[in-house]
Amino acid sequence: MPFLETIVELAPRLRRKEVSPLELTRACLDRIEKLNPTLNAFITVTAESALAEARAAEIEISRGEWRGPLHGIPIALKDLIDTAGTRTTAASALYQDRMPTEDAEVVRWLRQAGAVILGKNNLHEFAYGGSSLVSFFGDVHNLWNAAHIAGGSSGGSAAAVAAGLCFAAIGTDTAGSIREPAALCGCVGIKPTYGRVSARGVIPLSWSLDHVGPLAATVGDAAAVLQAIAGYDSLDAHSADVPVCDYVSVLREGARTLRVGVPRAHFYDDLEDEVRAAVEQALAVIETLVAETREMQIEIPTDRIVQNAESYAVHADHVARTPDLYQPETLRRIRFGADISAVEYIRCRLELDIERRRALNIFAKVDLLVTPTTPMPAPAIADLKKDPEALRPAELILLRNTRPFNVWGLPTISVPCGFTKSGLPIGLQIAGPHWREDLVLRLAHAYEQAVNFSAK
């Protein structure tokens, strides 16, 4: 069953023509047909074009025109990433028939790498939430227990990867929306440095905080996808012209020389017992893999005014004209930004830039930080829906540990580190200095190899 293999394992087999891109694509489409009615991970499945892309990849590979490790690999996209000729809805009635005429830059790079696009993943409407329970197309469910959330806002992407509906997915992360669902669904999700991956052609939530990155089954697969999409886009005002290293090759360097910081305050406060136990076990393993671990204190930044003001700026015209096309909870959140003054926003936006410079000081004596990704495992859907006032507080708790790294703009990954007694996944978060995705990936890979949770 090819869906049990990783991209890293399949790539050389595809190149040697031992496995067919058509075989992989059909296997994914079969699993989508079987499991998507339960998970609701996909809004749109582009079966016909995916099979055509797979056939084209097969022909190219047969001619010796292998493009790299993503050639012929089926991948999905969060449905706020533009795709030419395929609707991009942001999980909203407002955009249910929106048909882009151009691919987002990240999609263009994936196509250049030879990836097969399977379709568009469900999400929390306009990426404004951490549960994926607010979507015009219905709730996303967790593979490990369909009565629990998949997280958000990239909930459909995480659920699809965890269930083997695709080999990887591209998500977005404004406060944790790649890492939190990856943790809750038991897969790997990396938020690169702010500006590392182009966000041009991605429907924004907050320009200053939005990041684009991959979700995958393993660290190696996430590295392979990140390799294909990282780079400078001169037409994206937030893109940075910083060299990209070979993320796959650096995994072989291991973590033996790395120094790890453990910021106990905030990140380790008020953890559920099973999360605390799993993370402490993970730290014990990491101590055997690295040069040094040390506890440290970090001042935690805030971003609410920037996010609220920018999200309102994105939606103000539609909110004024067609408020009924938004889900009520999304509309309420967007309106948080309506009364923020220009003076207040500019001051807070300047402070965000200062915080990103201050983040350099975090790594004066350590190379990486390690924290729990979320303070608790995936909540039950029924618990969040029985009280309308319970949803946002629960989401804020789930995103508590991921949010600061969006303010700092630091590269950060979530990797599986255990399960609760009821079988729900638990995630470990690793963060590094700006532009040092390589360090983050090295420790994540070394830990993954030591514990082998991905095999489960």
Q: Residue ranges of each PLM-predicted region?
A:
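Short, well-ordered beta-strand elements within core beta-sheets of diverse protein domains
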Residues: 10-16, 94-99, 210-217, 334-341, ...
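Short helix-loop capping/hinge segments that flank enzyme active sites or metal/cofactor-binding pockets
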Residues: 70-90, 249-263, 294, 305-360, ...
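Serine-dependent amide/ester hydrolase catalytic core
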Residues: 9-12, 16, 59, 268, ...
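An N-terminal boundary/leader segment
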Residues: 1-52, 62, 288, 456
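Short glycine/serine-rich loop/turn segments
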Residues: 70-212, 265, 371-391
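Conserved hydrophobic/aromatic pocket- or pore-lining residues that grip, position, or stack substrates
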Residues: 28, 50, 72, 78, ...
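Structural helix-boundary/capping segments
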Residues: 34, 112, 162-269, 280-289, ...
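Long amphipathic alpha-helix in the N-terminal Rossmann-like dinucleotide-binding domain
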Residues: 48-58, 114-115, 124
